[in-house]
């Protein structure tokens, strides 16, 4: 399949979503990269069908950050393949990936991959560290490997019709033990 450009779109106030997304883009091996940073402003972008898109956003309270969702409204696909990435603060991403999937599909994208990564929580402090230093070197290496697998999937498809979508509902979420959740809630309340 002939895809030779990747459009990287991100919202990343603490830079963790940006770091993970950049690693995934590197892993694809595509060198023609267009970047849209939605952290400070909105953008109107129409993505052509033969362009891979990577969208990376943070999770706040188990959902895609509301401001990120607002700023993504101007992004439209034309049946374009998209990779969805949510970065959460080591508590839980809950239904954020499903929410982003519904949005991307409604905007005309074909979801071909989805991923969740841990980033240092925005409430993390020296006294109460929550995933400090994440994404770390191992996380970013895994993100690059994920990008390479996406490229393999694209290369294996004869055409867009054979670039099969992924059902993010089937991605197994890690179990959240009650004690760490309780400790987290105690710290932030």
Model-derived features with residue positions:
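Iron-sulfur cluster-binding cysteine motifs and their immediate structural context
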Residues: 189
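FMN-binding flavodoxin-like domain, especially the glycine-rich phosphate-binding loop
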Residues: 1-8, 12-39, 43-186
């Amino acid at each position: 399949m002939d895809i030779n450009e990747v459009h990287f779109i991100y919202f990343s106030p603490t830079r963790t979503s940006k770091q993970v997304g950049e690693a995934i883009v590197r892993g694809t091996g595509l060198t023609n990269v267009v970047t849209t940073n939605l952290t400070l402003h909105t953008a109107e972008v129409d993505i052509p069908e033969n362009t891979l898109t990577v969208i990376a956003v943070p999770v706040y309270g188990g959902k895609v950050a509301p401001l990120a969702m607002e700023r993504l409204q101007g992004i439209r696909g034309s049946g374009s393949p998209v990779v969805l990435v949510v970065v959460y603060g080591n508590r839980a991403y809950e239904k954020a990936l499903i929410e982003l999937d519904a949005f991307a599909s409604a905007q005309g994208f074909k979801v071909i991959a989805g991923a969740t990564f841990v980033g240092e929580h925005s409430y993390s402090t020296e006294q109460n560290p929550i995933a400090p230093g994440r994404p770390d070197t191992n996380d970013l290496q895994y993100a690059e490997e994920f990008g390479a697998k996406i490229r393999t999937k694209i290369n294996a498809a004869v055409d867009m019709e054979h670039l099969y979508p992924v059902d993010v509902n089937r991605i197994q979420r890690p179990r959240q033990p009650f004690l760490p959740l309780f400790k987290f809630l105690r710290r932030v309340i």
